[in-house]
Amino acid sequence: MVSLVLADTADSSDLSKAAITVEESTSAQQPKFFNYHEFVITKYRALDEESCEEHGPENPICITHFPNIYVPEESDEFRTTRVVRIPRRFESSTEFPNFSTQLPGSEPAALPDTHNKEFVPAGEFEGQWYGETSVSPLSNYLDQAEWTEIVTRINSLLEAAYNPITRRNFVNVILDLLTLNLWSIIEPYLFVNPLQSVEDYVSEINRSESFRLKGIKIIPPRESSYLSVCIDSPAWIKPCTAINEPLLTHCDTLIVLL
């Protein structure tokens, strides 16, 4: 990052007389990446409380999982699943979608964690449990190595699919010219879209024994317009009024890549 500093001059309106110095920012001043999907709230029901109370900015909880918008709102799956959203990394590439390989809570600017990267409920908000840190329920199902392997593969498939310099694209351009753009209408019905490789890989992961046993799945990125990766996971449900029930209610899990 570069900052410009204007020194005092006799005539401040005359910028040509202003002395401009360039100061290189230190690494500590550089922007740090965080999961921009998450946010904090201060009014919630803590574990030892019977009603929702205001806790102030010193004791917030972090919203790290969200309603499953990929199923009908009136369905059982909507009630029993939640979505963990994984953000894009625009500093890595703007030419094609590139998603974060870091589990929520592991990002440089994540809210600090003292529970060894495990999701630990601290408060209830709108019938769902949330923790005090950026760690999401996803960390209770996948470790960093597993997640990195999955997202790295997705990113590499997306890079290959969005690469404009390929033999297929070259042939398509020639045929479009020869057929007055009719080829671009016919071609999708004759050949598989390169992005289908991403969908096939996601389907393969969702069918894996590990994902089936854990009750989690990746939402195909196409459903989120490649804006994020979403994970479908079990809901962490506990109504405000049910303070004597078990801490967690286990349901099907949703993992989404956004």
Curated annotation (Swiss-Prot):
GO terms for biological process: protein targeting to membrane. The gene is ERF4. This is Ras modification protein ERF4. Its main location: endoplasmic reticulum. It holds the Pfam family Erf4. It comes from Kluyveromyces lactis (strain ATCC 8585 / CBS 2359 / DSM 70799 / NBRC 1267 / NRRL Y-1140 / WM37). Belongs to the ERF4 family. Keywords: Endoplasmic reticulum, Membrane. It is a peripheral membrane protein. GO terms for cellular component: endoplasmic reticulum membrane; endoplasmic reticulum palmitoyltransferase complex. InterPro entries: Golgin_A_7/ERF4, Ras_palmitoyltransferase. It is found in: Endoplasmic reticulum membrane. The ERF2-ERF4 complex is a palmitoyltransferase specific for Ras proteins. Palmitoylates RAS2, which is required for its proper plasma membrane localization. PANTHER family: GOLGI AUTOANTIGEN, GOLGIN SUBFAMILY A, 7, GOLGIN SUBFAMILY A MEMBER 7_ERF4 DOMAIN-CONTAINING PROTEIN. Interacts with ERF2. Signal peptide: none annotated. It comes from the Eukaryota.
